[in-house]
Amino acid sequence: MGFITKAIPLALAAMSVVNGAEILETRAGVQTLADKYIVIMNDGVTEKAFDSHRSWVNRTHRRRLVRRGAKAMGGMKHTYKFPTGMKGYSGHFDEDMINQIAKHSDVKYIERDARVQINAITEQDNVPSWGLARVGSREAGGSTYYYDSTAGEGSTAYIIDTGTDIEHEEFEGRATWGSNFVDDMDMDCNGHGTHVSGTVGGATFGVAKKSNIVAVKVLDCNGSGSNSGVIMGMEWATNDAKKKGADKAVANMSLGGAFSQASNDAAAAIANGGVFLAVAAGNDNVDAANSSPASEPSICTVAASTEQDGKADFSNFGQVVDVYAPGDSITSAKPGGGSQVLSGTSMATPHVAGLAAYFIGLGMPGGPGLCDTIKQKAIDAIANPGAGTTGKLINNGSGK
């Protein structure tokens, strides 16, 4: 699930109904994970009913293995419980078992789990970043970042990505490890997540230089993971933010793929939980309405601009885009120290998450409504933004 150059799609072409529950069908070419599924429960299913359903699934799965000699499968793997009420689980089931689950009256729909992948491009090291200067200026071509000294102090940014090098000098001890849903290595062995984190809250490269960074790892060293694993990270971040104060929290997902109802529903659950969420529009130069979670309307969807205030040639576009942000040749932190340059809507998105954290530091109300604040303060700057797309470029309101 990554937007730097190209992403393996998680497309859902059509819905079929199997005795009541929708089983979402994947398009040709999607790299699904064999016999692995995401099950989402009906709205309003109680904790008691959910517990009963999961017990039934576990019992039925075990009986199939023992009594029927069914193909060995892992069964239920992870349970999703968002504070806003969204419930579900992922698991490893054969076709007969998943059809039994689909018949259960408490099940809303089922998606095949799918593999996701990022592909980063490193251009060069140790060059100045133009993105920060653009966020703090009403005119292109500046070299100074103007910002209020509060700099996002008191805010927390959840970076749902490949992890973050929390020891990097950019973070000055403000970065912590949250949780890991992809492997047993609590480190960023890819570099994408550290770069994103640096743009949000790095001392040199960050929009909100005093914000706290929390690493939520959902992609491995190759930038690869699963849709179910990403949703696990989304759930964890939402629940952790609720404990610490959702109104002071922002989340960044420089991830995505083709349309996924489960991904969109999880993104909506983050927003409904009171957490601002910035998501990459995608890098295929197509309408982002076909991308997830970018197409979820309750979040802030970000397209990428160039240093000359043009639409980056790779950036997705369309009515679902809320705002543009710098995303072409952006310098930020890399694991182990120093910096690197990356391009993509992945790089544009943390400028927006960082700006949300910056506004929280100024005392503005947090939550998904911050996207409206960001749009109100944005400037009309993007030439040829794409059909039906806003030309608004983010600005921190410094007045410079």
Swiss-Prot record:
Domain Peptidase S8: 129-400
Inhibitor I9 domain sequence ranges: 36-118
The protein's enzyme class: hydrolase
Compartment(s) where it occurs, according to its Swiss-Prot or TrEMBL record: Secreted
Propeptide span(s): 21-119
Example of a GO biological process term: proteolysis
Stated name of the protein: Subtilisin-like protease 7
Organism: Arthroderma otae (strain ATCC MYA-4605 / CBS 113480) (Microsporum canis)
